[in-house]
Swiss-Prot record:
Named cofactor requirement(s): NAD(+); Co(2+); Zn(2+)
Chief site of localization: cytoplasm
Protein name: 3-dehydroquinate synthase
Gene that encodes it: aroB
GO CC terms: cytoplasm
Compartment(s) where it occurs, according to its Swiss-Prot or TrEMBL record: Cytoplasm
Record organism: Streptococcus agalactiae serotype III (strain NEM316)
Length: 355
């Protein structure tokens, strides 16, 4: 399977195929004729896939370096980015060379941020190995690092030269790491793909069901992401639908401490919480929040956050990128499979944090 992303100023393809990681070197050689490549990865993924990718690239004649950092959301910082800049400079990486992001969402966001800012931008590729990265963060060109104030507070828009997705890599994930990716998959079904929602309804929620259906749910998710990115590359309109559940979700991630609550888990809680309040305000049809709750519960996603503190969460989300002056934009669902953006006074977000 292949998904084409044809943007006005940059086009690339997303290759989705079981077992395609074993052909990554050949894939890269058809996209790049560069002399030097730095693979950016984390300590977990390096052990699983680092040596294989290095060997594949060397067989194609590339000079290869590897930068690995401690796995986890806590590493997605300007401090780690600065270490990578130093590594690239030490190895005399230039704008004619390239970066490959090998790993999950943290790796992809951080590596893409570095690539887009080092020497004002060098080329990069994404090889995502987690479900969250395969269905969401590796696609669309958003890069970013976290700060103590907010998630992804510092970032850029930069498109990769290609994305290689091998669903087989999901088999090396722990159960929690696999399940958290379903938060984003469920979101796609809710905002724009009723067929995907029906696929999820037919699944029994087990780990095996996720792995067995991986190719289909990744493809559907990539198609939804592609549609929104093509229509709104810089997140000014339609693409904002992809933020459903994220305003509250990101606040939960910051409040819990980066890495304590995984991204897809926080999104699941955020979707449920926002929908319940939106229903009470008659902004959404009754029953959708229960549908979301049931779907998240079926796949083993958390449906509540034990350390809920509405005042602290409000303070955090007031720094959200979707806030503008005294207003903030939220995403609501007129029906299953459809989304719209609704602007409210920032202060009204306190209502959406009421349990």
């Amino acid at each position: 399977m292949q998904v084409e992303v044809d943007l006005p100023n940059h086009s690339y393809h997303i290759k989705i195929e079981e077992g395609c990681f074993s052909e990554a070197g050949d894939w890269v050689s058809h996209l790049w004729q560069k002399q030097m490549i730095t693979i950016i990865t984390d300590s977990n993924v390096e052990i699983l896939y680092g040596e294989s990718l290095v060997n594949q690239l060397k067989k194609q004649g590339f000079t290869v370096h590897v930068f690995s950092f401690a796995a986890g959301e806590a590493s997605k910082t300007l401090e780690v980015a600065n270490r990578i800049y130093g590594f690239l400079a030490k190895h005399h990486m230039t704008r004619s060379d390239g970066i490959i992001a090998l790993g999950g969402g943290v790796v992809g966001d951080l590596a893409a941020f570095v690539a887009s800012t080092y020497m004002r931008g060098i080329h990069f590729l994404q090889i995502p190995t987690s479900l969250t990265a395969q269905v969401d963060s590796s696609i669309g060109g958003k890069t970013g690092v976290n700060t103590s104030f907010a998630k992804n507070m510092v970032g850029t828009f930069a498109q990769p030269d290609g994305v290689l997705i091998d669903p087989v890599t999901l088999k090396t994930l722990g159960n929690r790491e696999l399940v958290e990716g379903m938060g984003e998959v469920i979101k796609y079904g809710l905002i724009d793909d009723i067929k995907l929602w029906h696929i999820l309804e037919e699944m029994d929620g087990t780990i095996d069901s996720i792995l067995d259906s991986a190719l289909a749910i990744i493809y559907h998710s990539c198609q939804v992401k592609r549609k929104h990115v093509l229509a709104d590359q810089y997140d000014k309109g339609l693409r904002m639908h992809l933020n459903f559940g994220h305003t509250i979700g990101h606040a939960i991630e910051v409040h819990a401490g980066y890495g304590e609550i995984m991204h897809g888990e926080a999104v699941a809680i955020g979707m449920i919480q926002l929908s319940r309040v939106a229903e009470r305000k008659n902004l959404m049809p009754r029953g959708i929040s229960q549908d979301i709750y049931n779907m998240c519960l079926k796949f083993g996603l958390p449906v509540h956050y034990a350390e809920w503190d509405k005042d602290v969460l409000f303070d955090i989300l007031s720094h959200d990128k979707k806030a503008s002056g005294q207003f903030i934009k939220i995403v609501i669902l007129p029906q299953l499979g459809s989304a719209t953006v609704h602007q409210i006074p920032l202060e009204e977000m306190r209502d959406y944090l009421e349990k």
